[in-house]
Curated annotation (Swiss-Prot):
NCBIfam families: PRK09293.1-1, PRK09293.1-3, PRK09293.1-4. CDD domains: FBPase. Homotetramer. Its cofactor is Mg(2+). It comes from the Bacteria. This is Fructose-1,6-bisphosphatase class 1. Keywords: Carbohydrate metabolism, Cytoplasm, Hydrolase, Magnesium, Metal-binding. GO terms for cellular component: cytosol. HAMAP family: FBPase_class1. It is found in: Cytoplasm. Substrate binds at D115, G116, S117, S118, N211, K277. GO terms for molecular function: fructose 1,6-bisphosphate 1-phosphatase activity; magnesium ion binding. Mg(2+) 1 binds at E90, D112, L114.
Amino acid sequence: MSRVTLSRYLIEQTRSNNTPADLRFLIEVVARACKEISHHVSKGALGGVLGSMGTENVQGEVQKKLDVISNDILLEANEWGGHLAGMASEEMDNAYQIPGRYPKGAYLLVFDPLDGSSNIDVNVSVGTIFSVLRCPNQYLSQNESLNEEAFLQPGTEQVAAGYAIYGPQTMLILTLGNGVKGFTLDRELGSFVLTHENIRVPETTAEFAINMSNQRHWEAPVQRYVGELLAGETGPLKKNYNMRWIASMVADVHRILTRGGLFMYPRDAREPSKPGKLRLMYEANPMSFIIEQAGGASTNGYDRILDIKPESLHQRVSVILGSKEEVERVTAYHKE
């Protein structure tokens, strides 16, 4: 049986599920950009791409060279194709306007160009996270200037989401709203090839991912839940659990997606005015869409992530996602 490339898969989706051709082309362009980013990541010190730029992004985070390189690759790959009305990125303060010399399309692309980049200098897996939204009609005119409001849509409005993980293999995980597929980059062929047909989050779990160094700052429901996990067989859950923490959302969530468990980056008491660390638009929403399409669940402790109406482009949110039963347990603790 011949192997199914990403291009073939998307063409078949157009035929069988009426996936719009413009969306298909957009996903292919994003995938090509991810291949280029993968190349730069794999070169590391040989390509002179390690280290920081000496600048900060809108989040107040030090920008790595690869943050900027990856952001530029995604912008340059996608701006000219005629599929997008605009883009937004973790690395840019404001929405990116499609240059007037190019046609505007019907979609918006939101991305974290290099998630986990603080790990790049120590050769830990990093990735690219992206989300696709429809552009509101009032911004579709070639002469209409795009602003932040166009992007402020709840996660339920996503038409596609995915991430590329740059590890021992480069993989692309993708959902178009009808399940989750996994593609592995065949470097000899130069294409992403379908290798994981129907990814599902395992229902039972013995693993969780959280940064335990922040424990003293957590809210009581998270303290309670993690305490029960750590109590193991002698605790109320009557089961031993292992903790894994990579500090790269793509890597941690990829493990949860394939092996089950719970990923938690909850709000804490250090900055009470901030509802969390992770960004809603280009981290929590696409990852939550993927996890839900794979049979899992995602919450901020009180509400479903995908139901949250964004108030700003770089809004932060508490994130708890993974195996459905565990998410429901943590949510119940928050509501008691």
